[in-house]
Every structure is written in C-alpha cells, then in structure tokens.
A protein has these predicted regions:
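N-terminal pro-sequences and low-complexity stem/linker regions of secreted or lumenal proteins
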Residues: 2, 6-284
C-alpha cells in the first residue's frame, strides 16, 4: 500500500530541497500507531508574517482563492483594504525585482491591530498597518517554505492568538493565556498588571546582556510585573517530560522576545534549576 509519506516523497522529490527529501526518506517510527510513537516535537516561532503573506497563493488553502471571503461594509471581498483614500488589494512583493524579502516593517502593536480589526469589520488594514501589509510572497520568493508546506501538513488560514504584537502571542504560546487564568475564570477584566497587550515583559531591562558570557547574568532586570501561572515548561517539568528552548539570552538581539521571560518561574530561576538550564542558556 502506498502511504501518504511515500506519495509525498515521490511527488516532491524533484522540487523539494535536499533537507526535505532527506527527511521524507527516513522511515516513519511507527510502533504503536499512537501518540506514544512521537518522541520529539520541534517548534520554530516567527513573527510579523501573516498566513496569506506567505501562503496566500499556495494551492489547496483558503488563501487568495477563498470562495467565501469575509465581506466588507462596501460589499466587496476582504482583499480590498482601504488606506483611507483608496483601495489596495493584495500585490506581489517580487524578490526578483526588488529587495522584497527585507522590505519595510509595518505597525504591529495592540492599538493599530485593534483599529485594523475594527470590531470585525476588517476594512482598514492598509490604513493602520500601511499598504506594505497587503504585499505577499510567491513560490519563487520563498521556495523552502512552499516545499515544506507541500511535503508535510499546513494548517489552513493559521492566525495569531491575539491581534497585537510578538510578546503577547509568545506568552500565549508558552502558557495558553495572555491574561491571568484565575481572574479570567472570575469574569474580571484584565489590566496591564495581569495581562500583556503590547511588547513589554519579554525583554531584559536595561538591555544588559554580556557579550561572550555563556550564562544569563544575575544582574538582569525585567520590565513589568511577573506572571505567576504555569507555563508549558513548568507543566512538562511536573510531568517528567524533557524540553529545551534554543534561545541564548546572551546572543539573541539583547535576549528579546523570549516568551517565558514574563513569568516568575523563569525570571527568578537559579543556576541548576530546570528552567534556568533548559530555558535560559541556549545550548543543548
């Protein structure tokens, strides 16, 4: 019987990168046919790239070919975003004719994101995120990402957990919440003391990393109050499951945007603690 893995290996052999072909060639480690066969989960988290920005032109996803796009107040499909004076549909950021892969940064904080969302009306993305937000890449611009998506599984129309910046979404990723769960359960609205609407807590302050030092320094100070609910690594520690974060506090653009730095269990971790060894030192 031809498995999905066999089919994909043959279908992508000519086009896929060598690293992807090598991965597909490795026999699946199927012993029980259950989740117990999974030994390692590797997650790479990027920022500031929307689903359609990468995969809007990929066949088989609800990208620019979506048959049922969100309607705007004007009655037009959601692609026709306004900058306040004109409509700007999606356009190709062609890396063959420009420095499109670098391009320009766009706003990505809570205020501009909420304004673009506009209570679900979604009509002013180009106004509050700038027209650059409407640019997208194609297969020739990001061939490796397209090869991965076609060789393995892609989650259709995958979006951020919270319509705001990087730190809040990384806090959700590492803990399942951006707002103290106990308060949420009581129906109490969040404040900036117990939630993260904008980038704040996931940076050392001042940015006092020490170049060349192999360990986080005891002099690190952090911005904002500590969060004290459990992170995913805390739960894995309790369950006896191994984990590691490959982000070096002393060699990663000032240690910025490490999602666990918002939490007391990481901010106050001491040398030898699991969260210190596996969460703050970078190496294996």
């Amino acid at each position: 019987m031809t498995t999905r893995r066999d089919f994909l290996a043959g279908a992508t052999a000519a086009a896929a990168f060598a690293s992807i072909r090598q991965a597909l060639a490795i026999p699946a480690r199927r012993r029980t046919g259950t989740i117990q066969d999974v030994k390692h989960v590797v997650i790479l988290m990027q920022e500031n790239r929307s689903f359609d920005h990468y995969f809007g032109t990929l066949r088989g996803v609800r990208g620019f070919g979506d048959r049922f796009p969100i309607p705007l107040e004007s009655g037009k499909p959601v692609w026709f975003q306004s900058d306040g004076t004109r409509e700007i549909p999606p356009y190709h950021r062609d890396s063959a004719t420009s420095n499109a892969l670098v391009g320009y940064g766009t706003p990505h904080s809570f205020g501009d994101s909420q304004a673009a969302w506009n209570q679900g009306k979604m009509g002013y993305w180009a106004k509050y995120k700038t027209p650059y937000a409407m640019g997208y890449f194609g297969r020739d611009d990001i061939p490796f990402q397209f090869a991965l998506a076609e060789a393995f599984t892609i989650c259709d129309a995958y979006h951020a957990s919270i319509t705001t910046g990087t730190d809040p979404n990384r806090i959700v990723f590492w803990s399942g919440s951006n707002f103290k769960p106990a308060l949420r359960a009581q129906g109490i609205n969040c404040t900036t003391n117990d939630a993260e609407p904008n980038n704040l807590r996931c940076w050392p302050n001042p940015h006092n990393w020490v170049a060349g030092q192999p360990q986080p320094q005891a002099t690190y100070k952090y911005v904002g109050s500590d969060f004290n609910w459990d992170t995913l690594p805390d739960l894995l520690n309790k369950a006896g499951v191994s984990w590691h974060i490959y982000q070096d506090m002393n060699d990663n653009w000032t240690g910025a945007m490490h999602g666990c730095l918002a939490f007391s269990s990481f901010r106050h971790a001491q040398p030898g603690d699991p969260n210190y060894v596996h969460g703050l030192t970078g190496g294996p």
